[in-house]
Amino acid sequence: MTYFVFFLSLCFVLGGLAVASNPSPYYGVVGLVLASVAGCGWLLSLGVSFVSLVLFMVYLGGMLVVFVYSVALAADPFPEAWGDWRVVGYGVGFVGVLVMGLVVGGFIGCLNFGVITVDSTGMLSVRLDFSGVAMFYSRGVGMFLVAGWGLLLTLFVVLELVRGLSRGAIRAV
């Protein structure tokens, strides 16, 4: 289990690196999906299964729609892949910054494999993520409404920004 969590953390970092190296949106979405699956798997291994499932469903339901729009509007005849020199240069630079951060920060505790699970005492224990669901819907109604309106406003702002010369989303390719 320890090596599995280490593998998930490595996949999470590599997925973030795949997005941050700035390839075409066609390839950047693959890195985001990899990072999302690894992060939700990491939460799942810690025992927070419901929150992991909700985060994954929200990600697939919401964020991939934004990437469909960005891929449709990008319409590059020659998209930049991960093998292009500029993208490889960004990736090498980010790995260099990561290595320098580990060297300057020290390796104390980095190689100490061990995972403490949440609520592993038995069947009679109340899971923290399940009791948190009631708090989401009872105390968090106002925040959900504010977040929903914020996301709706963000959708309209992004659609207005990518509209381009009052022609809408349909462009001549």
UniProtKB/Swiss-Prot annotation:
InterPro entries listed in its UniProt record: ComplexI_Subunit6, NADH_UbQ/plastoQ_OxRdtase_su6, Nuo/plastoQ_OxRdtase_6_NuoJ
Cystine links in this protein are none
UniProt keywords, alphabetically = Electron transport, Membrane, Mitochondrion, NAD, Respiratory chain, Translocase, Transmembrane, Transmembrane helix, Transport, Ubiquinone
Where found, per UniProt? Answer: Mitochondrion membrane
Reaction(s) catalyzed by this protein? a ubiquinone + NADH + 5 H(+)(in) = a ubiquinol + NAD(+) + 4 H(+)(out)
* Stretches that traverse the bilayer: 1-21, 27-47, 48-68, 91-111, 141-161
Which EC number applies? 7.1.1.2
Listed under GO cellular component are: mitochondrial membrane
Q: What is its main location?
A: mitochondrion
Molecular function terms, GO-annotated: NADH dehydrogenase (ubiquinone) activity
Membrane topology, as annotated, equals: Multi-pass membrane protein
Question: What is its biological role?
Answer: Core subunit of the mitochondrial membrane respiratory chain NADH dehydrogenase (Complex I) that is believed to belong to the minimal assembly required for catalysis. Complex I functions in the transfer of electrons from NADH to the respiratory chain. The immediate electron acceptor for the enzyme is believed to be ubiquinone.
| Family under the similarity heading | Belongs to the complex I subunit 6 family.
Q: Which PANTHER family match?
A: NADH UBIQUINONE OXIDOREDUCTASE SUBUNIT ND6, NADH-UBIQUINONE OXIDOREDUCTASE CHAIN 6
Official protein name in the record? NADH-ubiquinone oxidoreductase chain 6
Name of the gene this protein is made from: MT-ND6
